């Protein structure tokens, strides 16, 4: 039987990335709360080296 987690960077960025967070009101609220907490990584697409991809 196939496992449930089949990692894909493209799907990861599209589902949890910065653009998706900015596209909805609740997503912007998530970013605001992560900024307020002082997170260095706001979203999965803001990781080191992947910001331009």
UniProtKB/Swiss-Prot annotation:
Domain of life: Bacteria
GO CC terms, sorted: ribonucleoprotein complex; ribosome
Pfam families the UniProt entry points to: Ribosomal_L34
Keyword Ribonucleoprotein part of the UniProt annotation: yes
MF annotations from Gene Ontology: structural constituent of ribosome
Keywords: Ribonucleoprotein, Ribosomal protein
HAMAP family per record: Ribosomal_bL34
Similarity field: Belongs to the bacterial ribosomal protein bL34 family.
Protein name: Large ribosomal subunit protein bL34
Organism: Chlorobium limicola (strain DSM 245 / NBRC 103803 / 6330)
Lineage start: Bacteria, Pseudomonadati, Chlorobiota, Chlorobiia, Chlorobiales
